[in-house]
């Protein structure tokens, strides 16, 4: 059936074909305090 995964392709995967990438700095979520300050600034 088509809904069963084909693990043969995964087992024969060549890791050397992957490209090395530099990780970028992630955007962190604002803290609760920052959100509260922005809400107060918008309402006034």
UniProtKB/Swiss-Prot annotation:
It comes from the Eukaryota. It is found in: Cytoplasm, Cytoskeleton. PROSITE patterns: THYMOSIN_B4. GO terms for cellular component: cytoplasm; cytoskeleton. One of its GO terms (biological process) is actin filament organization. GO terms for molecular function: actin monomer binding. Keywords: Actin-binding, Cytoplasm, Cytoskeleton. Plays an important role in the organization of the cytoskeleton. Binds to and sequesters actin monomers (G actin) and therefore inhibits actin polymerization. Belongs to the thymosin beta family. PANTHER family: THYMOSIN BETA, THYMOSIN BETA-10. This is Thymosin beta-10. It comes from Torpedo marmorata (Marbled electric ray).
